[in-house]
């Protein structure tokens, strides 16, 4: 009887020990499985992150490529710039290398109109077509009805300097001068204004061009010739578009003018635009 009881107790302890061992194995299995799953999830998450990053890198690369294409649209073509003064060529070349714009400021009276169909607007469009968008930044400062003396009195040099010009293409308002006081002092006043402009807009290259021809004038052409001499003697580039106009002593000039002693008509702006375009964009 005692022997059977001992056997039962032994079996009980054996089963208890076995159940403890099974429990330990179960816990170990659960922990191991959880660790394995966590690792698998972590690996999967890591791969997803890499894929996302790769896509992002491709997108950035595409953006950079697009930026290069945009930059490539604006470039310095030495063949186009061969007519320009060396100083201006260097400015254009450096601007292209630095991916910046050359600030060209066109100054004048109604002859250098800021209107859409005027020569200045046509030149702006042609510069963009040839050199690409962004290399030339063109601003037109049209001082309607202001004589050369009034440009000085109104301190227009300081206003122009605010545009931070690299190049200034100045058309002294000789037609306006003629209508107000005559052209007797036009060249002397031009000299004063150009000197003021040189001081206010330090570093800018100043180029001079005449107003358009007018019909049947006597003294006005002499003043224009004196302007050309002033520019040449003082080493200012003179953009002489007069050679492309019809003979102003004949009525053949009239279709190119708004009135006999006036500013350019649409046809006048077209031939003026063609000349300055050929100057800035050599063929």
Label for each model-derived stretch:
Residues 2-102, 281-283:
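N-terminal secretory targeting modules
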Residues 95-182:
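Conserved SGNH/GDSL esterase-like catalytic core that processes O-acyl groups on lipids
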Residues 128-132, 165, 173, 195-202, ...:
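Sec-exported extracytoplasmic/periplasmic mature domains
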């Amino acid at each position: 009887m005692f022997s059977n009881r001992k056997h039962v107790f032994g079996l009980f302890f054996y089963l208890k020990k076995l159940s403890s061992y099974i429990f330990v194995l179960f816990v170990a299995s659960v922990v191991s499985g959880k660790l394995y799953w966590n690792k698998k999830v972590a690996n999967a998450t890591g791969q997803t992150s890499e894929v996302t990053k790769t896509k992002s890198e491709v997108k950035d690369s595409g953006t950079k490529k697009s930026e290069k294409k945009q930059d490539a649209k604006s470039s310095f073509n030495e063949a186009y710039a061969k007519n320009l003064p060396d100083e201006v060529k260097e400015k254009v070349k450096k601007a292209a290398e630095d991916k910046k714009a050359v600030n060209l400021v066109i100054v004048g009276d109604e002859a250098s109109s800021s209107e859409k169909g005027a020569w200045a607007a046509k030149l702006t469009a042609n510069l963009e077509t040839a050199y690409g968008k962004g290399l030339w930044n063109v601003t037109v400062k049209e001082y309607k009805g202001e004589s050369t003396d009034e440009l000085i009195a109104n301190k227009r040099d300081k206003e122009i300097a605010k545009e931070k010009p690299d190049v200034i293409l100045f058309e002294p308002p000789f037609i306006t001068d003629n209508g107000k006081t005559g052209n007797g002092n036009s060249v002397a006043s031009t000299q004063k204004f150009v000197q003021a402009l040189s001081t206010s807009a330090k570093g800018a290259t100043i180029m001079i061009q005449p107003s358009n021809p007018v019909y049947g004038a006597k003294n006005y052409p002499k003043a224009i010739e004196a302007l050309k001499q002033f520019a040449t003697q003082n080493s200012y580039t003179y953009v002489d578009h007069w050679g492309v106009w019809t003979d102003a002593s004949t009525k053949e000039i009239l279709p190119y003018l708004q009135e006999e002693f006036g500013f350019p008509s649409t046809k006048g702006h077209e031939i003026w635009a063609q000349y300055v375009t050929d100057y800035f964009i050599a063929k």
